Structure formats: C-alpha cells, structure tokens
C-alpha cells in the first residue's frame, strides 16, 4: 500500500497547482524538506515549496504566469521558475542532473524527463523522496523513509559519485547528521574520508554557510565529530582536530578537543529565547565556545615541576580565530565578536584569584562591550572539572562578579541622572546666590526625578517654587 501525504487540507494551493500541471499533461512533485518533515512528523510551517516537474522552464513559466500573483525567472538557467501566491513562494524546477567535472566549482546542468534520474542525483536518500501532486502519493525509490526511521544517512547512488559531482555534499552530510542526530552509513563515511581533499575546490563562502548551519543545529557535536574523524576538518577548520593532540590534565578530559565540545554544549544550554540577550541558536557564542582554546597547541609548555602551561593562549587563540574566519569569508562584525570572546575568556580567573577593584570590573565590562552577555555564558561554561567543590567555587566567584557588575551599572545609571534644572537655573528661579541652599534645592529636584521620573522644566520649576515656599525662605 502506497503512502500518502495529506496535501489537500494542508497545502491546497500546491494541490491546485498540481492539478493545473496535470491538465497541461505534466507531472508535478513536492520535494525537499517539506516531504522529509511530513514523514518525520515534524512538518513545521512552510511558506517555501520546492517542486520538480517534467515540464520545461518555458512551459512552467506559462502555467505559473496564469496561476501566481507574481513570477520570476532568476533561476531559469538552472531550470527553476518561481511564483508567489497567498504569501507563499513556489519554486518549480525541471528534472535535471548536475555534474561537477574535476577541479570545477560549478555544475553543468542538463534537463531531463525522468523523475528517477532527477531524484537519484540528489544528495541523500532522506532528500530524494517526492510527493505527487495533486494526489500526495509518496515516491520513495531509494528507501529514504526507512533511512529516516533508522537514523542513517545514505546517498541514492554510490557516495563516490555523489561527492564527486558536488564535494560540498560531504559538508552537508555532517550538517544533516548534526541536525537530525544521524549516523552516516559506513560507505558514506569511507567516501568522505577518501575524498576529503576535494572539498578544496568548493568556494570558502559555501563551506562557511554549511559550517554555520552545522554549528547552529541541534546536535553540533555529532557533525563536528564527523568532520574530524573523516579528515574534512583538516581542510575547513584545521585548528579543531589539532586540539585532539593536546593533553590538558586540568580538565580531566582525554584532550582539549573533548573539553571544547563540552564547553560548547554547556554554552548552548545557556542560550535564551528570542527576547533574551543570546537568542538560540547563537552562532557567535557557540563558535567562540568551540574555539576558545585553539591557542593551546601553539602555547603549550612543560614546566620543571611536571605541569603544563598555556600562557597567553587566549591572545594567540584570538589571532588564530581571526585568521581562520577571514579565510572562510566571515563578515568583520562576526569575526570581531568571536575573537573578542576568545581573547577575554580567561580574564575572569584573575577576578577569582585576586579580586578586582571597581575600576577593574569596569574595564572588564568596557573590554567586553556588546559581547558581555555572551562572555558571561562562555566563562560559566568553561568549567568542565569533575571536582564539584572547584565547580561550586568558580560558579560562586562568577556570581559575585556579575553582582558587582550590576551594582556598578545601577550606580553609574544613578550618577548619570540629572534633574531638569542645574545650579545656575536654580539660582535664577529662586533669586539666590551660590551657597548651601542651592545644594539643598538641587537635592530636592534630584530626589523628585528619581521618585517620579522626568517632569519637564516647567513642572520642575513650579515644584521647586512650592518647595522654596515651604523650606527655603524659612
């Protein structure tokens, strides 16, 4: 018995469009994330619909022009015609096959008339399913439904063929593993390991975009481990696997790499909702947490007493972060934010060990700037010791630092508050000379401002005269 999606009640406009294609003698299928989400029982709210058809781009353009409120053909070269209707976007693409030739970054595109040929070129079986329109019947030629249920990532054909055509699919494998907590099939893992160097033909911008999606997924550890274990990380983020070789006994982890993953996961737990200071998923916080110790391999030093030190690994790490993020074509604001967090992540330990003056606390706030809330979360997350007493001590010290930051901020806000009238205006209104009465009047107006908020100069003058009649002249 074939499986069907309930498209009529959920997506009536898509069904209507499918009927128009059917009447014109063409097939139309829903593909992509919507089909996958429906089959995982996590459909979400879709306003963008990916579709595929055996109609040519010109034929799709004719159908969509009569149906949609607005159409555009910016993707026509690749077989895609888009339309907008009732607030949703429909992208209809002619069956096609993309082929990357050796050392090429761009695909050659060939249109076809066979659905199987179109689906087999897709990256993974979980993305190679289609829902026929208007019926909603599922077409699953490569057992994507089974792979979804089993949590396995496979390719419709051999992974070597798939990754040869588009090496970015290796990054996408890690991203989907991180998004859905999937295990890659052994043959996919082996192909990624063998073909990892081919990622170098892909533009830095495309690699960066996949890395961001991976870091912001629900299970980033899964995807990052896959990048490291297959060797892909050595080409896109080589500082990460370097941490596996760096023993750090202070954290009781097998290496700094494991500690860094744990810090990232603890930082994720401290993200906020959309109205908070660090809305989830917070890429800057996550990436800084992951890379906060990347300066350790270059600063490791064995001391005479047998201990290991990493002096200035924060400063060195910040420089390394900037260099790597520039290579990946990140924007300057994001680079500065991540680098600043890496640079400052050790500053808190000075407070714990010696305590700070008010001016030192202010410098901490000033140096953190807009990253203060993220720095709070990174510093608290950078505690992975199994020593519960040590963990409590660190948490209490940071509680104290945050309390002092809040107290100083409140005092500075108070100090910055001024009444509506200054000393010169008070003397002019009351007709008095400089002296203690001016100070008393100023204090009265300041308390009035604190109690009642902004009054305006006219009302403040009236209230001052009332006060003067009751207190000043006597």
Q: Residue locations for each model-derived region?
A:
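Catalytic cores of the polymerase beta-like nucleotidyltransferase superfamily
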Residues: 1-474
């Amino acid at each position: 018995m074939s499986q069907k999606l309930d498209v009529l009640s959920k997506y009536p406009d898509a069904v209507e469009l499918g009927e128009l294609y059917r009447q014109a003698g063409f097939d139309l299928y829903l593909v992509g994330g919507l089909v996958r989400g429906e089959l995982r029982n996590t459909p979400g709210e879709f306003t963008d619909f990916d579709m595929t058809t055996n109609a040519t781009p010109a034929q799709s353009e004719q159908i969509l022009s009569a149906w949609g409120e607005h159409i555009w053909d910016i993707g026509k070269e690749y077989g895609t015609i888009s339309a907008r209707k009732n607030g949703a976007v429909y992208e209809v693409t002619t069956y096609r096959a993309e082929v990357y030739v050796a050392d090429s970054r761009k695909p050659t595109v060939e249109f076809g008339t066979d659905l199987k040929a179109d689906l087999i070129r897709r990256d993974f079986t979980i993305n190679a399913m289609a829902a026929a329109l208007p019926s909603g019947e599922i077409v699953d030629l490569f057992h994507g439904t089974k792979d979804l249920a089993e949590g396995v990532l496979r390719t419709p054909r051999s992974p070597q063929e798939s990754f040869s055509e588009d090496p970015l699919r290796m990054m996408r494998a890690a991203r989907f593993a991180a998004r859905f907590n999937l295990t890659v099939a052994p043959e996919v893992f082996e192909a990624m390991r063998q073909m990892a160097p081919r990622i170098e033909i892909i533009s830095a911008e495309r690699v960066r975009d996949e890395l961001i999606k991976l870091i912001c997924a629900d299970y980033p550890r899964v995807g990052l481990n896959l990048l490291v274990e297959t060797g892909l990380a050595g080409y896109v983020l080589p500082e990460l696997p370097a941490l596996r070789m760096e023993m750090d006994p202070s954290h009781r982890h097998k290496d700094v790499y494991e500690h860094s993953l744990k810090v990232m996961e603890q930082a994720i737990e401290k993200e906020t909702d959309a109205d908070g200071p660090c809305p989830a998923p917070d890429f800057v916080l996550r990436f800084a947490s992951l890379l906060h110790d990347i300066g350790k391999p270059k600063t490791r030093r064995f001391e005479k007493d047998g201990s290991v030190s990493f002096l200035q690994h924060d400063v060195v790490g910040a420089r390394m972060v900037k260099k790597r993020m520039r290579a990946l074509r990140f924007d300057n604001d994001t680079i500065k934010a991540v680098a600043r967090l890496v640079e400052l992540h050790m500053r808190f330990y000075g407070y714990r060990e010696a305590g700070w003056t008010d001016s030192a606390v202010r410098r901490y706030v000033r140096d953190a700037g807009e990253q203060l809330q993220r720095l709070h979360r990174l510093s608290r997350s950078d505690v992975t010791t199994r020593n519960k007493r040590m963990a409590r001590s660190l948490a209490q010290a940071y509680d104290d630092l945050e309390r002092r930051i809040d107290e100083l901020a409140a005092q500075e806000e108070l100090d910055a508050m001024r009444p509506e009238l200054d000393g010169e205006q008070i003397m002019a209104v009351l007709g008095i000379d400089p002296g203690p009465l001016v100070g008393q009047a100023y204090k009265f107006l300041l308390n009035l401002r604190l109690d009642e908020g902004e009054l305006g100069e006219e009302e403040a003058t009236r209230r001052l005269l009332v006060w003067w009649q009751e207190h000043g002249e006597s």
